[in-house]
């Protein structure tokens, strides 16, 4: 499993690669946030239920419904209107999700060439989108009403992009050259 690998082998190899003095200074993954925006079709409760069901199957955790903070007439939404769902993964579930993401979902993604270094935010975190949530094996293609995308944010304790990229490369994330 990726969690035990992260704490032992990855940390020891990062100590020498990053020039740190001990294992506690090495960056680690803190949490993974998954967000699925639904858009204007959120008025239909069936769409909302299917999105929360799909995200729950992907993350193995019940998602929270996100609601609009203020009304925007141009988008035809009112305050409190459901606009998506999100889930935050930590600990064992986070490492299980990262393992499935790296080894199953990203290779199945259509036209995926690797993550870009421009997706790092300058503070050691990375955000990217997955175009089709059916890349995950947990989602049954016959039971979905529409193929949707989702956003993935990986938060690390790294203070810069170089340390974060080194951590993600050790975990097995594919980066473009």
From Swiss-Prot:
GO cellular component: ribonucleoprotein complex; ribosome
Domain of life according to the entry: Bacteria
GO MF annotation terms: rRNA binding; structural constituent of ribosome; tRNA binding
Keyword terms of this UniProt record: Ribonucleoprotein, Ribosomal protein, RNA-binding, rRNA-binding, tRNA-binding
InterPro entries from the UniProt entry: Ribosomal_uL5, Ribosomal_uL5_bac-type, Ribosomal_uL5_C, Ribosomal_uL5_dom_sf, Ribosomal_uL5_N
Pfam families assigned to the protein according to its UniProt record, in alphabetical order: Ribosomal_L5, Ribosomal_L5_C
Protein's name in the database: Large ribosomal subunit protein uL5
Organism annotation: Anaplasma phagocytophilum (strain HZ)
């Amino acid at each position: 499993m990726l969690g035990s690998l992260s704490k032992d082998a990855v940390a020891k190899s990062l100590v020498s690669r990053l020039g740190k003095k001990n294992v506690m200074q090495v960056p680690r993954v803190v949490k993974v946030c998954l967000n699925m925006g639904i858009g204007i079709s959120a008025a239909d409760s069936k769409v909302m239920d299917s999105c929360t069901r799909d995200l729950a199957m992907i993350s193995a955790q019940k998602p929270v419904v996100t609601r609009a903070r203020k009304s925007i007439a141009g988008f035809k939404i009112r305050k409190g209107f459901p606009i998506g769902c999100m889930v935050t993964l930590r600990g064992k579930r986070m490492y299980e999700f990262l393992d499935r993401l790296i080894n199953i979902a990203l290779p199945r993604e259509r036209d995926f060439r690797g993550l870009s270094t421009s997706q790092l935010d300058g503070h050691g975190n990375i955000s990217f989108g997955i175009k089709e949530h059916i890349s995950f094996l947990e989602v049954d293609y016959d039971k979905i009403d529409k193929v949707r995308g989702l956003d993935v944010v990986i938060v690390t304790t790294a203070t810069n992009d170089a340390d974060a990229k080194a951590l993600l490369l050790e975990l097995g994330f594919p980066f473009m050259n």
